[in-house]
């Protein structure tokens, strides 16, 4: 009991969108679905390692036939871009070597870092690495998030807190954090702090309010209108059983209409 599902995966397709936008049904080596999944994971790991101090919130990957588009959302775009774009060019060259395709690198700035759960988790982890008391780091993150307009925040730390011999978990919550409400806009972030006592896991949930009725219906309409999705322009499958009865019933409905004029001519 008490196990928490990832809020991002739980609301995927409802209030959250995919962060890898592509599809592959090829059997060719290097272009298979599993190859792209592994490549996406490698891209995210390399970016997180190289841009650890840049405050990367999320990375969105979109693929076409001959190009890979990588969108980096960061709180410190100056570190990612570098002097005269040198750092961005280095990152792009590294991604092109990894993927073997042309890479389009886009850098977006996160306007309010206090409301981004991933950035809040990274901030707490940095303070723990710098030997700041964990309760003080949690309290400061809560206050900053609530001042920025959050409806609620929940922070959980797990590990050897304060250098204790036995590991434990502590969490603080302020406001409302409805994890079971699908329309709730909840941002989730996780980061590990590397301290002298070991690693401390930091989890952050931030509640930003509920999605309105009009926004919810609009997003559902966009999901249903996608080609190849249910409710959209979907082609019938081969051997579809539902189409067979309709084809069999069609001639039966036309037969009485043809017999009616023949009965009138006899009279």
Curated annotation (Swiss-Prot):
Gene Ontology biological process terms in this record: translation
Biased composition annotated in UniProt, kind: Low complexity: 241-267
Keyword tRNA processing listed: no
Domain KH type-2 residue range list: 43-111
Keywords: Ribonucleoprotein, Ribosomal protein, RNA-binding, rRNA-binding
Matching SMART domains: KH
Molecular function as annotated in GO: mRNA binding; rRNA binding; structural constituent of ribosome
Pfam families in the cross-refs: KH_2 (PF07650), Ribosomal_S3_C (PF00189)
Region (Disordered): 216-267
GO cellular component, one term: cytosolic small ribosomal subunit
InterPro entries, A to Z: KH_dom, KH_dom-like_a/b, KH_dom_type_2, KH_sf_prok-type, Ribosomal_S3_C_sf, Ribosomal_uS3_bac-typ, Ribosomal_uS3_C, Ribosomal_uS3_CS
CDD domains: KH-II_30S_S3 (cd02412)
Keyword RNA-binding included in the entry's annotation: yes
NCBIfam families: rpsC_bact
Family of the protein in this entry: Belongs to the universal ribosomal protein uS3 family.
Chain's role: Binds the lower part of the 30S subunit head. Binds mRNA in the 70S ribosome, positioning it for translation.
Subunit and partners: Part of the 30S ribosomal subunit. Forms a tight complex with proteins S10 and S14.
Family matches, as HAMAP family: Ribosomal_uS3_B
Protein name: Small ribosomal subunit protein uS3
